C-alpha cells in the first residue's frame, strides 16, 4: 500500500465523529493504522469498522474519558501495544456558550477539563515513548477562538488559548527529540458540535438559529462553514514527513474570515 503515512500509527481522540472521524479517515487513506478514542464504544466500533472496510487498515477503538488520568494511561498503554504511537491528534472537546455572568462554575470547569486537561493527560502519556523513540507528531485541535475573544464564549476561548499556548511551549521542549507539535485553528466546522454551538449561541444572543446561520455564512468570504475534510487535509500534511520542518505553529483554517 502506498501513502504518506504507511508504517505509522496514529491515536485520534474524539475520533468517532465530526472532525476527529474525518482526520482518522484522512490518515487511513494515507496508510496509517489507527487508534480512535471516544466515550461511546458502539459509535467507536461502527466508525472503526467503516474505516477498516473502506481503507483496509487496522483500527483499534478504545472508549476512555480523556479527562481521567488513569483511563488515559490505560488507553495509551493499549495503543502502544497495538502499534507504537507516532502521531497524536488531540481532538476531543466540548463547547458551552453562555454570557459570562450567567456561566455556572460547573459548566466553566467542564469546558476547561474537557478541552485543556485532556490535552495535558493524553500528550504527557504519549510523549514518554515518543521521546524514547526520538520521533513524534502532535497535532492539537484548537480554534480561531484560541486567537481572539468573542462574546458568550469565555470558557471555550480560554480553553483554546490554552491549547495554543501548550502547543508552542511543547514545540520548544520536544524539538530536540525530533517531535513536532502544531495546532490547527479552524473557524466553525459543519459538525454536530457546531449545530449545538449554533443553538446555544443563538439563545445567548437572542436571535433565531436560522438568522444566526445566515449571518455566520455571510461573515466569511467563502460564504459557508468549513467541511471536516478541509481540516483533515491539513492534519494529514502535518502528520507526514512533508511537514518535517514545521513546528510550533497555530494554523488558521477559516476561509478568510480573519481578514474581514
Predicted regions and their residues:
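Conserved glycine-rich cofactor-binding loop
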Residues: 9, 16-17
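The beta1-alpha1 cofactor-binding region of Rossmann-like NAD(H)/NADP(H)-dependent oxidoreductases
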Residues: 41-42, 63-75, 105
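Substrate-binding pocket helix/loop in short-chain dehydrogenase/reductase
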Residues: 99-100, 104-112, 216
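C-terminal substrate-recognition "lid" of short-chain dehydrogenase/reductases
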Residues: 120, 127, 135, 222-253, ...
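Active-site helix of classical SDR
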Residues: 123, 159, 167
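Residue(s) in the substrate-gating loop at a strand-loop-helix junction
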Residues: 143
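Short, small/polar-rich loop/turn modules that mediate ligand/substrate recognition or access, typified
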Residues: 175, 180, 246-248
Amino acid at each position: 500500500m502506498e501513502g504518506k503515512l504507511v508504517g505509522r500509527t496514529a491515536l485520534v481522540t474524539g475520533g468517532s465523529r465530526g472532525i476527529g472521524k474525518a482526520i482518522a479517515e484522512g490518515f487511513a487513506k494515507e496508510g496509517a493504522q489507527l487508534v480512535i478514542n471516544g466515550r461511546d464504544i458502539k459509535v467507536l466500533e461502527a466508525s472503526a469498522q467503516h474505516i477498516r472496510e473502506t481503507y483496509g487498515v487496522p483500527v483499534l477503538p478504545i472508549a476512555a474519558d480523556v479527562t481521567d488520568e488513569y483511563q488515559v494511561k490505560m488507553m495509551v498503554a493499549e495503543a502502544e501495544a497495538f502499534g507504537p504511537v507516532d502521531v497524536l491528534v488531540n481532538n476531543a472537546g466540548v463547547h458551552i456558550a453562555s454570557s459570562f455572568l450567567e456561566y455556572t462554575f460547573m459548566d466553566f470547569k467542564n469546558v476547561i477539563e474537557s478541552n485543556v486537561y485532556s490535552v495535558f493527560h493524553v500528550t504527557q502519556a504519549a510523549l514518554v515513548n515518543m521521546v524514547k523513540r526520538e520521533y513524534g507528531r502532535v497535532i492539537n485541535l484548537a480554534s480561531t477562538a484560541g486567537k481572539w475573544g468573542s462574546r458568550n464564549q469565555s470558557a471555550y476561548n480560554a480553553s483554546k488559548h490554552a491549547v495554543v499556548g501548550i502547543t508552542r511551549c511543547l514545540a520548544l521542549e520536544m524539538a530536540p527529540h525530533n517531535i513536532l507539535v502544531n495546532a490547527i485553528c479552524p473557524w466553525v466546522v459543519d459538525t454536530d458540535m457546531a449545530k449545538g454551538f449554533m443553538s446555544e449561541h443563538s439563545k445567548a444572543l437572542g436571535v433565531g438559529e436560522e438568522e444566526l446561520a445566515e449571518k455566520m455564512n455571510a461573515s466569511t468570504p467563502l460564504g459557508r462553514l468549513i467541511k471536516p475534510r478541509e481540516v483533515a487535509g491539513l492534519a494529514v500534511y502535518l502528520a507526514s514527513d512533508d511537514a518535517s520542518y514545521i513546528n510550533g505553529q497555530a494554523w488558521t483554517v477559516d476561509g478568510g474570515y480573519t481578514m474581514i
